[in-house]
A protein has these predicted regions:
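Short beta-strand segments
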Residues: 39-43, 68, 104, 129-134, ...
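A glycine- and small-aliphatic-rich helix-loop capping segment at beta-alpha/alpha-beta transitions
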Residues: 52-61, 85-89, 144-155, 216
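N-terminal glycine-/serine-/threonine-rich phosphate-binding loop
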Residues: 1-38
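Class I SAM-dependent methyltransferase SAM-binding "motif I" and its flanking Rossmann-like core
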Residues: 136-187
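Ligand-binding beta-strand-loop-alpha-helix segment within the catalytic cores
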Residues: 2, 61-132
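ATP/nucleoside-binding phosphotransfer catalytic cores, i.e., glycine-rich phosphate-binding loops
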Residues: 187-190, 194-248
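Short glycine-rich anion-binding loops that position phosphate/pyrophosphate groups of nucleotides
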Residues: 44-45, 133-138, 144, 205, ...
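Glycine-rich N-terminal segment of FAD-binding domains in flavoprotein oxidoreductases
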Residues: 27-55
């Protein structure tokens, strides 16, 4: 399988190219169906992309529904500790008309919230998934493509590993792993792959090795590896990603 790989020499070009492609895909959906559903992950490298996307012209945001890949239980989605906080700061604050009914409510009854979210996403066609994997190849809180929760339709409760939880010990977020919640809600790989279009964004020195996991000859259990099955996958590489020639 030949991968659609886009290399960018600057962060500015990285952010601009991805936001323009995302905006174009949203516009196409709005023209063809009158609505658009967008799935977003919450890695830091999406912040600049979301800022530019929020200012894109020609998008009626009142007809756009947002879904989030994962979030922790017991955390308000508007809190700085929430995985959805970047969506609030970078996208929703600028476009309050966006439908937020499908965002994760980590303060709700967990089993009821999973049922609610799964019903909503299974009723929709996800037009665009804008994703940025974690350093281990995880997608949100989902870290194994072969786990039971990765094969269901919709969302599930999950217990992220210590390695996943450590990745959220960051300035302005959690000060130590002991503060990071031990349970969350995450979307299955099966549901992610139902998206019409997937933009996979890689940036940061620690993520260079992830490109190899997208190579067709590499077997991996990391969820990022499942994305290579998708016929409309586009991989965007930031300037700090070292490229393996075999993956070109």
């Amino acid at each position: 399988v030949s991968l659609n790989v886009h290399r960018h020499t600057s962060i500015l070009h990285f952010n601009e190219a991805i936001s323009k492609q995302a905006a174009a895909l949203i516009r196409i959906s709005l023209v063809s169906t009158g609505q658009a559903s967008v799935l977003l992950s919450s890695e830091p490298e999406l912040e600049g992309i979301l800022t530019l996307l929020s200012a894109s012209e020609g998008i009626d945001w009142s007809k756009v529904t947002l879904f989030c890949l994962s979030d922790f239980l017991g955390v308000s989605r508007s809190s700085r500790l929430s995985m959805q906080n970047d969506l609030h700061r970078k996208l929703l604050a600028q476009n309050p008309a966006i439908s937020t009914k499908a965002l994760i409510n980590g303060e709700s009854v967990p089993s009821s919230e999973v049922t609610r979210l799964s019903f909503l996403i299974n009723q929709q066609t996800i037009d665009l998934a804008l994703l940025s994997p974690g350093e281990t190849g995880a997608l949100g809180l989902l870290e194994s493509a072969s786990s039971e929760i990765s094969t269901i339709d919709g969302y599930s409760l999950c217990e992220p590993s210590d390695s996943i939880r450590k990745s959220f010990v960051q300035p302005n977020r959690f000060k130590s792993i002991n503060e990071v919640p031990q349970r969350g809600i995450t979307l299955s790989t099966k549901s992610i792959l139902r998206a019409k279009n997937i933009l996979c964004c890689l940036e940061g020195n620690k993520k260079s090795a992830l490109l190899n996991l997208l190579d067709d000859g590499v077997i991996t259990d990391a969820p990022i590896g499942a994305l290579k099955k998708h016929p409309a996958l586009h991989i965007h590489l930031g300037p700090s990603i070292s490229v393996n020639p075999a993956a070109s």
